[in-house]
């Protein structure tokens, strides 16, 4: 064991590693936690919180919180975020106890449902009050799930942003740009869970794994604390142009909200490769990133060596302080080109695509989602009114038939005078 001698300062204190906790809220969040655990995510404590006791019993998290049993009797929130919110408030002390001692808390949830949408902002508020760096990584519904659910998700994300240091949003709709249309439903949702896992892992690895140019918890905290919306991209490359390809794929990751980092005020760039990673390749990565962002943006970079990378290079880019106008609220992707999960280009691996594939998809002029019939929103609204759902749900005015959800929320509200 290595002995570390501390310079005397006259003060007594205890050295301890960074404590990172991940809490999954609701069914979607619990599924993401299961995925992270099955992939062997290290140096992280896992918690699952749900109003549905039966669903909670299937969680593999070592700590399970059945929240809101007085409100829901353990039967779930029924898709109502207000019930999810009340459930989390009912068991605020239990949530605080589970999160106690954490330096960093990740909150993961599927937005648009009941428990995740309602409970996640409450959990974020508790975590932040405990002094933890609070990062939410959440998904938004598929477009076919309807306008009402999308509006609930957007409202939940806005609440979450208020109480979190940073929010990373992954629209499920964008999965359709990278999986084959014949991909089974179960596998598609596994890809969504894996995206949540990769987002959390790419950040936690920066803190827990050593590097040649090291990044630590304070680097991550200074980049993400109080920054609102964030974008994260992870790209891998191999071959002669592996570093540049990895950087290009990272900043053009189509699976997040439209990845436009131009307005970011802070960036954290991590480069990981094997022992043959050269300084010239690191310089190439930073050059690609620098050409994309504001020259006055603060950039923190780190480099680490991992023998298991072999001939591959992985680049992680975390961009924070992103203006809301740079975020695609509707979560659309303008590409209709589908990429089979078994046929990625030679310079890309996992669920990410190469720079060449990205450029081909981006330049495609075909209409989005061919074969899907146009949903009749008027019929949907009529059914909702018959069921007594009218006016506001979870504090959200239901959208009219004529509203364009491709327009960002803040612009729609401004036009309404809100």
Curated annotation (Swiss-Prot):
Region annotation (Disordered) ranges: 386-418
Main location as per UniProt: cytoplasm
Disulphide bonds in the chain: none
Compartments, record wording: Cytoplasm
GO biological process, one term: protein polymerization
One GO cellular component term noted in the UniProt record for this chain: cell division site
Pfam families for the chain: FtsZ_C (PF12327), Tubulin (PF00091)
Keywords, alphabetical: Cell cycle, Cell division, Cytoplasm, GTP-binding, Nucleotide-binding, Septation
GO function terms (MF aspect): GTP binding; GTPase activity
Chain sites annotated for binding GTP: 27-31, 114-116, 145, 149, 193
Assembly information from the UniProt record: Homodimer. Polymerizes to form a dynamic ring structure in a strictly GTP-dependent manner. Interacts directly with several other division proteins.
HAMAP family: FtsZ (MF_00909)
Annotated family: Belongs to the FtsZ family.
Role description: Essential cell division protein that forms a contractile ring structure (Z ring) at the future cell division site. The regulation of the ring assembly controls the timing and the location of cell division. One of the functions of the FtsZ ring is to recruit other cell division proteins to the septum to produce a new cell wall between the dividing cells. Binds GTP and shows GTPase activity.
NCBIfam families: ftsZ
Protein name: Cell division protein FtsZ
